[in-house]
Amino acid sequence: MTGIVCLDQEDGLLFNGRRQSRDRVVTEKILSMTEGKPLWMSAYSRRIFPEDAPVCVAEDLVGKLAEPARKDAEQVESAQEELEREKATQKEPWQQPGEAAFCLIEEAVDLENEIIDEWIVFRWKRVYPADVFLKFPADDWEKELIETFAGYSHEEIDLERYRKKNRAKF
């Protein structure tokens, strides 16, 4: 799964429980890059997207992402039974191994999460007040600058990709 976040120049994510900034061009780019694939977010994040945007809202998104990605051997049978019962219902991406999905994160999250193996970062070219940070340790993550573009309310925004270094290449 690919996580999407917006950070400032000092890796700030939130201040006093709120996003630092937003930009409508970023919202458009997120919808463009995820077109045709599930885009999960919290109800808080949903408010910045158009009403007709094809997004999926999950309450306690970060909590669900923190659940173990793999079941113990003793839990496999129980998990298979549960999956059979839910077969006809829409499942969340972390219950669908191998399905390409995206999630927009606007709250504190653990980078050691096994479910998210790639991050897309929209980086504001400013420093905002922040009390929640998301730092990518250089030893664990490879950084790639994809592009710098003009936003609606920001002169420049960097689009970066971070991938786990130990990620298997196929």
Give the residues covered by each predicted segment.
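Enzymes that bind and transform nitrogen-containing heteroaromatic metabolites
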Residues: 1-170
